[in-house]
Amino acid sequence: MKSKLILLVAAIALPIQCPSAFAQSCDDDGEYLGRLSANPFLTDSTANKFGSFGNPYASDSIENPYGQYGSPYSATSVSNPYGTDAPKIIAADGQYLGRLSASPYDPDSVSNPYGRYGSPYSPTSINNPYSQYGSPYSPISPNNPYATKPPILCADDE
């Protein structure tokens, strides 16, 4: 009984003491902007309107049309078609998946249909429904509304 209690306390306390052991993170020079996900129940999902990263009023949310990452005029915004420094998308397995940008001209943009990260035929594109990164059934895809490990968004700190 005593050993079960110790295991229970350790299972609860370890994630609190060492959250980085269980969470994916950005580089040392990047700012974490949440998880690019269709899952509205993940606390750090961009689809969670009540969370910090999906809230249209949060300053660092890509959903805030007046914020740095959601404004149609900011160079670091996901919705600026002429943006030059949109957030990076990093998959749970560490694969770089391009930039979450509305620019159809940026070679790293997921909106460039001829680019490596925007093509619906590329294996590293979130727009390819047959790849592990774009499938609506993959646990690491942003397009799966039940995904548990969707990719993270990282902004470049300057």
List each model region and its residues.
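C-terminal segment of classical bacterial N-terminal signal peptides
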Residues: 12-20
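Bacterial N-terminal signal peptides that target proteins for export
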Residues: 1-7
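Repetitive, compositionally biased segments used for assembly/scaffolding
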Residues: 20-158
